[in-house]
A protein has these predicted regions:
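Short, acidic, metal-binding catalytic loop of nucleotide-sugar glycosyltransferases
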Residues: 26-39
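Short, hydrophobic beta-strand segments that form beta-sheet elements in well-ordered domains
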Residues: 39-46, 120-121
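A short, glycine/small-residue-rich beta-strand->loop->alpha-helix junction that serves as a flexible
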Residues: 16-24
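Conserved catalytic core of nucleotide-sugar-dependent glycosyltransferases
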Residues: 83, 99-184, 188-189
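Well-ordered, non-membrane alpha-helical segments in soluble/globular domains
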Residues: 23-29, 105-107
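C-terminal catalytic/acceptor-binding lobe
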Residues: 2-4, 8-14, 176-265
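Short, solvent-exposed loop/turn segments at secondary-structure junctions
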Residues: 15-17, 47-50, 68, 97-99, ...
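Active-site-proximal specificity loops/subdomain of glycosyltransferases
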Residues: 43-94, 101
Length: 265
């Protein structure tokens, strides 16, 4: 039986696999390995447990990634390394607590055939989940979707947990600190400024975020006032990057919302 090669490489940089984070990250990363066709998957960073789960799931692990003086990964180096090692035409950054199902593969495969240069994003659905997913059960996807549907918390457009893009689109990024605001809007602006189709698959893909606390970092309010956030905001100032809105703290771009995936033809 021949194996269909995926056109997608997913990459992530997990947090330490401690406590609840160990459970939800294992759930998420394992779900990626079950996509059909299975994507190439890279895990970056030397956080506790990353090497072990990479070995267990047959995932490539790259412990080295550039960090700032606060030990925060830098997106320019992270994205550069991912593209350097990827063998596929589509590359995607994803947060390591996001569970994906085959509707995701269907959507991006469809759009890849129709766009040469693109960035695909989507809003997440939040759900409280504190146990391991049983992937041996044929209905695991439906059970998780049902739980997310009951919670009925689809986050707004500023909560983007995955960015799927055509190869070469994200070359030469600015050195933003990962997870310190601004960089997600910057990626959207960059895609549009480079002539890419910006595609929102939220209506057709339920990307499920397993809720967690923020014990891995400073309190949310403290992070917003941190030197890293201030530095990120300075880099996105419109004096250096022109935006259509000229709004100093926000990149305004228009996205095409994908409301239906036609599987015929």
């Amino acid at each position: 039986m021949s194996v269909v090669k995926s056109d997608l490489t997913l990459f992530a940089i997990p947090k330490n696999f401690h406590g609840h984070f160990a459970t939800i990250q294992r759930n998420a990363i394992t779900s990626w390995t079950r996509l059909n066709p299975r994507p190439e998957i890279f895990l970056f960073g030397d956080e506790d447990g990353t090497a072990e789960i990479a070995g267990e799931l047959g995932i490539r692990h790259f412990p080295e990634v550039a960090r700032n003086e606060f030990n925060t990964p830098m997106i320019d180096d992270l994205f550069r390394r991912a593209e350097q090692h990827a063998t596929s035409p589509m590359i995607g950054y994803i947060n390591s607590d996001i569970v994906l199902t085959d509707e995701f593969s269907l959507a991006i495969g469809h759009l890849h055939k129709r766009h040469e240069k693109f960035m695909i994003v989507g809003r997440r659905w939040d759900v409280d989940w504190d146990r391991s997913l049983d992937f041996s059960q044929p209905g695991w996807e439906d059970s998780l979707r049902a739980a997310a549907g009951r919670a009925n918390v689809q986050r707004p457009g500023n909560c983007i947990d995955y960015f799927i893009f055509s190869r070469g689109l994200c070359n030469g990024l600015l050195p933003f600190a990962l997870g310190r605001f601004v960089h997600d809007n910057y990626l959207l602006w960059l895609a549009r400024s480079r002539g890419a189709a910006l595609l929102d698959i939220s209506p057709v893909v339920m990307a499920i975020h397993q809720n967690h606390d923020y014990s891995h970092s400073q309190a949310f309010a403290d992070v917003r006032q941190s030197p890293e956030v201030r530095r990120n905001r300075i880099m996105q100032d419109p004096g250096g990057i022109s935006t259509r809105s000229r709004t100093p703290r926000k990149f305004c771009v228009k996205m095409e919302r994908i409301g239906r995936i036609d599987t015929g033809g």
